[in-house]
Amino acid sequence: MRNWSFSKAALTVSLLALSWSPFGPAEVQAYPIYAQENYAYPREATGRIVCANCHLAQKPVDIEVPQAVLPDTVFEATVKIPYDTEAKQVLGTGKKGPLNVGAVLILPEGFQIAPTDRIPEEMQTKVGKLYFQQYSPEHPNVIVVGPLPGKKYNEMVFPILAPNPATNKDVHFLKYPIYLGGNRGRGQVYPDGSKSNNNIFQAPVAGTITSITPGEKLTRVTLKTVAGTEVVESIPAGPDIIVSVGQTVKADQPLTNNPNVGGFGQAETEVVLQNPARVQGLIIFFAFVLIAQVFLVLKKKQFEKVQLSEMNF
């Protein structure tokens, strides 16, 4: 894998986010850089991946890896982020557009994305033009991708290079966990806790709606409380207003629909770093068992022949 510096990596993700967002880095769909800037490590002690802090809806993801791999070999980790590819999400402008996807893959220590010259041609075809980035220089085993066009990348192949305990004394022939976080669509909350326009907006107080003033970027809903105080809730373009003037609402009652069609999911699996000597020993053992079985059959047939000859005599 290329040895990008963290500053270059962050700049690359920022540029990637800009290419997807009309508002640049403020767009919630630029989730990789948000996670990298706000969290030293993407997986909390509870097992929760931090992307779930901004992407509130839960959706399934899946990961497939071989049951066992040999040291210093390249294997595939197939990540699947299923969703309805015909669905449209609310963009930062309030308009509808296609969903983007992204993923964070937390590999065991010592495992990493395989260098280009180590990836077999057939595997490289499956990988395509995916760009893999280290989460940080301190965690080269944590890989992030995205945002990417969902229709093209709702299934991704990560080429993983297994470590060699002979050259890396921190690695052993054991069973290791692999963790996946995968997302489709934009988030509902910014890192500072404020809502994006891909979220439900509720009434801040109980009262009667006295006016709804639509605008190009904001719709202002004015509520009058029982005490006569007027409170204005500003709703960005995107979600649909589901209340009307004169309607009485309770505090926290939805003023809009839920425009979110995406969501975040987690999955985990295991891979065994297999000792080649153990495999060879197992093959030799099975060979001896097979030879013993053959000799047993031959001996049995020889015994049957002796018995038959004695009976004839």
UniProtKB/Swiss-Prot annotation:
The chain crosses the membrane at residues 279-298. Heme binds at Y31, C51, C54, H55. Binds 1 heme group covalently. InterPro entries: Cyt-f_TM (IPR024058), Cyt_f (IPR002325), Cyt_f_lg_dom (IPR024094), Cyt_f_lg_dom_sf (IPR036826), Rudment_hybrid_motif (IPR011054). One of its GO terms (cellular component) is chloroplast thylakoid membrane. One of its GO terms (molecular function) is iron ion binding. Keywords: Chloroplast, Electron transport, Heme, Iron, Membrane, Metal-binding, Photosynthesis, Plastid, Signal, Thylakoid, Transmembrane, Transmembrane helix, Transport. GO terms for biological process: photosynthesis. The keyword Chloroplast applies. Its main location: plastid. Disulfide bonds: none annotated. Gene3D superfamilies: 2.40.50.100, Cytochrome f large domain (2.60.40.830), Single helix bin (1.20.5.700). Belongs to the cytochrome f family. Component of the cytochrome b6-f complex, which mediates electron transfer between photosystem II (PSII) and photosystem I (PSI), cyclic electron flow around PSI, and state transitions. The 4 large subunits of the cytochrome b6-f complex are cytochrome b6, subunit IV (17 kDa polypeptide, petD), cytochrome f and the Rieske protein, while the 4 small subunits are PetG, PetL, PetM and PetN. The complex functions as a dimer. This is Cytochrome f. It comes from Nephroselmis olivacea (Green alga).
